[in-house]
Curated annotation (Swiss-Prot):
Residues spanning the signal sequence: none
Protein name: Large ribosomal subunit protein bL33
Keyword Ribosomal protein: yes
Residue spans of biased composition, Basic and acidic residues class: 1-11
Gene: rpmG
InterPro entries referenced in this protein's UniProt entry, alphabetically: Ribosomal_bL33 (IPR001705), Ribosomal_bL33_CS (IPR018264), Ribosomal_bL33_sf (IPR038584), Ribosomal_zn-bd (IPR011332)
The family this protein is said to belong to: Belongs to the bacterial ribosomal protein bL33 family.
Length: 55
């Protein structure tokens, strides 16, 4: 059985609301930290989300 090459990560809002998304990413194809614009329901607008470690 092959091991999964994907790692669970947490995308945390830069707006300071404490909102976060969880997702997975392939460490071999994307070794750098992920930054993506997503909707923050607490701020009620699109903001940048940065990757942090999932505890």
């Amino acid at each position: 059985m092959a091991k999964g090459g994907r790692e669970k990560i947490k995308l945390e809002s830069t707006a300071g609301t404490g909102h976060f998304y969880t997702t997975t990413k392939n460490k071999k194809t994307m070794p750098e930290k992920m930054e993506i614009s997503k909707f923050d329901p607490k701020a009620r607008k699109h903001v940048m989300y940065k990757e942090t470690k999932l505890k």
